[in-house]
Regions:
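N-terminal catalytic cores of peptidoglycan-degrading enzymes
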Residues: 1-108
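Basic/polar, cationic surfaces and motifs that engage anionic cell-wall
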Residues: 2-13, 19-25, 29, 110-113, ...
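Short glycine-centered, acidic/aromatic-flanked micro-motifs in structured strand/loop junctions
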Residues: 35, 42, 117-119, 204
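General small-molecule cofactor/ligand-binding pocket signal
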Residues: 89, 155, 228-230
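Short glycine-rich, low-complexity/disordered patches
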Residues: 195-197, 226-232
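A short beta-strand micro-motif
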Residues: 198-204
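A short, charged, amphipathic alpha-helix used as a generic interaction element across diverse proteins
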Residues: 209-227
Length: 232
């Protein structure tokens, strides 16, 4: 049995949890990745699990009845400074996460699993990589557990808005761009189970006669090389 990626900290006081609306048939249809938009990477800000996350004296986490938002999961730092993922709702319960767009809402039909990543000040590359790696691992696990989720439907809030099924937000693309990444990079990360693919540029030269030039070019093109030739 695979080890759990998340710890459970259900937001039982949140009205979304209390409503308990089940996802429709064919859902979860995808996953939306959000980021919080505030410089606070600590899970205790959003998750009521003091034994894991630490105490939040303000109690302004998602586990309260006076808030109209609740994602399925939150990724951030626990009380020991480790990147962890908290599960706030059952995966097959509709969350209140992305709002609505011109065509409807991915909160409901079709329903998407939605995960918040706690932002820091967007300058710590080590935290960025660790947080998105764990989120990618979680997405890969969810795809395995729910075959209705396809890779092209793992999207950001910004992408959900562009499709017409979410409110006008820019997360988490702005954070990805800080480190030269985008959602295509994240989807590839999910595809590879959270491991970033390292690519190498291979170049070389080979001298051939005019008679063999066409054959040599064809062989290199078949291997995926960009081919150029010059007279020596």
């Amino acid at each position: 049995m695979s080890e759990p990626i998340t710890f459970t900290a259900y937001a039982v006081k949140n009205l979304c949890y209390i409503a308990g609306r089940k996802m429709p048939a064919g859902s979860p249809a995808g996953i939306i990745i959000h980021s919080t938009g505030a410089s606070n990477p600590n899970l205790r800000r959003y998750v009521n699990a003091p034994e894991i996350c630490g105490e939040n004296p303000y109690k302004n986490y998602f586990d309260r009845p006076d808030i109209d938002i609740c994602p399925h999961g939150v990724v951030g730092l626990d009380k020991d400074g480790a990147v962890r993922a908290a599960k706030l709702l059952p995966w097959t319960m509709c969350c209140w996460g992305c709002g609505s767009g011109a065509k409807g809402s991915y909160n409901y039909s079709p329903a998407y699993i939605q995960i918040e990543i706690c932002e820091d000040d967007l300058t710590d590359e080590a935290y960025f990589k660790a947080a998105f790696k764990l989120t990618a691992q979680l997405c890969a696990r969810l795809m395995k557990n729910y075959p209705t989720i396809k890779l092209n439907n793992i999207i950001s809030h910004k992408e959900a808005c562009a499709r017409g099924y979410a409110s006008n937000h820019g997360d988490c693309d702005h954070w990805l761009a800080k480190f030269g990444k985008n959602m295509d990079w994240f989807r590839e990360l999910v595809k590879n189970g959270g491991e970033e693919v390292v690519r190498y540029k291979v170049t070389g030269t080979k001298t051939v006669t005019r008679a063999d030039l066409g054959k040599a070019q064809a062989q290199l093109i078949a291997l995926g090389f960009d081919v150029d030739a010059e007279v020596l």
